[in-house]
């Protein structure tokens, strides 16, 4: 919807306390013999707030929504996102985001539909062309709906008092990332079986997420983003 294309506040907390920072980073590194591991000094999980549904001027304006950017670096520390976009690579790469191992927080309750990804998260691909420019800077257009990659996205969380692992997978199609049976792109949370058969995973890791609060609860937001 429109609010997701525009974006929203980065209300990401640093700790379980009611104290939030606007920007939160989690870093993983690939270690020989160990696979993807949490980098030393990195936060281990995201603490987020449940989305509230509002309307402004007759338009659906949910808040908060979270901008989520993914950056890949090579062993030299050089940004390598372009390798998944340029020279036709954008036609065979797509990130998928699937909540797993869903459970209530200490003050929450299990619900019958907790294992339905659509009740937990909503994600919109907001990749841009060029890939390394922004619409905010008027240097790029949002093209994620017609060519989803997932290096840039908007995510909102639909239930509070939940913990889960957000499985992030980067699909690499042998020839295409389009579902051959439907002629469309698979939804962000569920790559189809036939798509999986026709490609491989470049990235497959999970990030813990805790949805502590809902939109009506008071939370301090710290301006310092360091």
Give, region by region, the residue ranges found by the protein language model.
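Extended, polar beta-sheet/loop recognition surfaces of beta-rich domains
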Residues: 78-136
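Short beta-strand elements
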Residues: 22, 181-226
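Exposed beta-sheet edge/beta-hairpin loop segments within beta-rich domains
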Residues: 56-66, 84, 131-184, 188, ...
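Residue-level recognition of well-ordered beta-strand positions that form the cores
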Residues: 29, 71, 169-171, 210
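N-terminal edge beta-strand
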Residues: 18-61
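Beta-strand-rich structural segments
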Residues: 68-75
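Bacterial Sec-dependent N-terminal signal peptides
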Residues: 1-10, 226
């Amino acid at each position: 919807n429109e609010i997701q294309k525009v974006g929203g506040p980065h209300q990401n907390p640093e700790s379980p306390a009611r104290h939030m920072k606007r920007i939160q980073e989690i870093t993983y590194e690939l270690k020989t013999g160990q696979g993807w591991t949490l980098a030393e000094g990195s936060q281990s999980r995201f603490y987020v707030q449940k989305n509230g549904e509002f309307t402004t001027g007759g338009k659906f304006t949910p808040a908060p929504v979270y901008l989520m950017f993914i950056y890949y670096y090579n062993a030299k520390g050089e940004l390598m996102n372009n390798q998944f976009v340029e020279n036709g690579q954008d036609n065979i790469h797509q990130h998928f985001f699937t909540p797993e191992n869903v459970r209530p927080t200490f003050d929450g309750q299990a619900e019958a539909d907790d294992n339905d990804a659509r009740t937990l998260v909503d994600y919109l691909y907001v990749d841009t062309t060029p890939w390394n420019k922004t619409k905010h800077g008027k240097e790029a257009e949002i093209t994620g709906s017609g060519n989803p990659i997932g290096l840039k996205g908007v995510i909102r969380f639909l239930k509070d008092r939940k913990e889960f692992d957000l499985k992030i997978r980067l699909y690499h199609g042998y020839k295409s990332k389009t579902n051959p049976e439907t002629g469309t792109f698979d939804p962000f949370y569920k790559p189809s079986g036939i798509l999986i058969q026709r490609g491989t995973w470049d990235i497959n890791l999970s990030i813990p997420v805790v949805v502590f609060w809902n939109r009506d609860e008071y939370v301090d937001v710290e301006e310092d983003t360091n």
